[in-house]
Amino acid sequence: GLREWFPIAFFRSSPDLTRLCTMLLIVGGFLLVIAWLRFRPSIRDDDASLRRVIRTSVIWALPLLICVPVFSRDIFSYVAVGRLMAAGIDPYQHGVNEIAGWYSLGVDPFWSSTESPYGPLFIAVAAVFSWLGAGIPEYALFLNRLAATAGAVLMVVAFLKIAALRGRNRAFVAWMIAANTLTLLLFIA
């Protein structure tokens, strides 16, 4: 699994290396916020600026799309709920601790015995991702991340259409929504 992959296993092998990675993640997050704020003043209301903001957003998002989950363990719960449903266990009656290996998936133990708060469509999609992942959590994680990224893209498209209809600066809206560090770190990473 992902935890046994050499770079991850190496950095998890020592508390000092884990702390170093945590500090680098925090510094990287701050640098991303600073880059996003500094990027703002150069945005004009024209198609070239819009393309530049979208291109920059994609460049910033790509590494986050393939990195291990950061800042939240929720995505591990999504995978576990999908596995629960795929195993034929009602997630509205049972917690993910009903499936073998739930803890090794990365689910927060605090939520392990809690019934699912997610709607039926979400759970059905999570079950499909679990099935497509063929029991390999990393595949299901990536499929969940792709779905979240697709949702973020649809959100950006919708906001850009609204901005165009209202006569607003679409490049500014793209900066606020697509390039925003919250969108990148919470929807994609």
Predicted segments, located by residue:
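Intramembrane catalytic core of multi-pass membrane enzymes that act on lipidic substrates
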Residues: D47-R145, T149
